Amino acid sequence: CVFFGDTDAVEPRQPQKELWDGPSCGLDGASEIFGADEALSNDPMIMLHVIKGAVTRCDHLYVDLPQQMTIPRQTQRNPRFSIHDFLAPPSPTGYDMFVRKTDFDNVVRLLSDRRNTHSLAKELDVMRSRKSDNEIKVMRAAGAASGAAMTAVMRAVRPGLAESEAQAVFEFECARRGAARQAYVPVFASGRNALMIHYVRNDSLLGDADVMSVDAGCEMHGYASDITRTMPTSADGVFSGPQRDLYEALLRVLKGCTALATANQGYSLSGLHRRSVEMLSSELRDLGFQLRAGTLERILYPHYIGHWLGIDLHDTRSVERSTRLQEGMVLTVEPGLYVPDDPAFPKAFRGLGMRVEDDVAVREHDNVVLSADAPKEVADIEAVCGGRI
């Protein structure tokens, strides 16, 4: 049998602070709400005493301590040295912070073998990378709210509307559907603004012959959604010929990559990205693009096909892109094209920036598109933008 306990160190309730900031969990809440076996004050000396007592009895230690902001990321110390510094700060005897010298010796023994100390964050990321059915239900609700909000934006777009007004529509529609907040600073990029992948000024007026790429998503019950759609801003709500051709090329790549996002096919995020590059290369050549080596990934499609999604927008960062997709993982699939005003590219497509993105929950033999409520077929987008549905 394996026995374990959960001891939470939390800030005690402070009536004066709660007067300003509202109620807090406190020690009672740690047990009653979060199910901790034991709750104690987060006073540093109390925590130090408890942690030192636990460390002397364990064979493996999983830990991540707050990093000093002045230490560059590449020079941060590994968990072994960080916990050593925390448990045994410089002192005249080397072990006077411990009750017994044997405790100090046990800590030295534990920390002397790098195989015994591990990053807790990496272990948590592995667990977080596969969502439960309930987590996926919450993410589906976030995707549905964002999808409905995206539809409302399509209904609102017209020449002369400010990007910021479209943003306000999106945020209002998310809020009235129960979203706590936006999951990130949204992109409402019309015309040539869409050539900037992370354009967030959102202060231009929509033109009559442009498209607008909207990259936005709400957070619901702590989980993020992340959706991108591209829509015409013309008075009739219809794409021009070149706009439609480029968008449909992207849409085929999105669908092709989404179809590969199942556990049984053995793909990883890296594998999906390679396939997206192959698909986009083929689509662009069919549209008359002359692609030299590296042009696609260096200029036209400089970002990755997607990222993990969950509690964080870019979730579980320590889970490698080379990790095979497993049931319960959630990822974004977001091919994009950004054609600069350069004679190297067909004139009809110059100045067009587009992206289309879905949130996908992986299953063994298929997947679930969590953002399916946001229109993405050309006919549907034009019908909504044109006020026909």
Predicted regions and their residues:
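Active-site neighborhoods and metal-handling regions in enzymes and metal-associated proteins
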Residues: 1-389
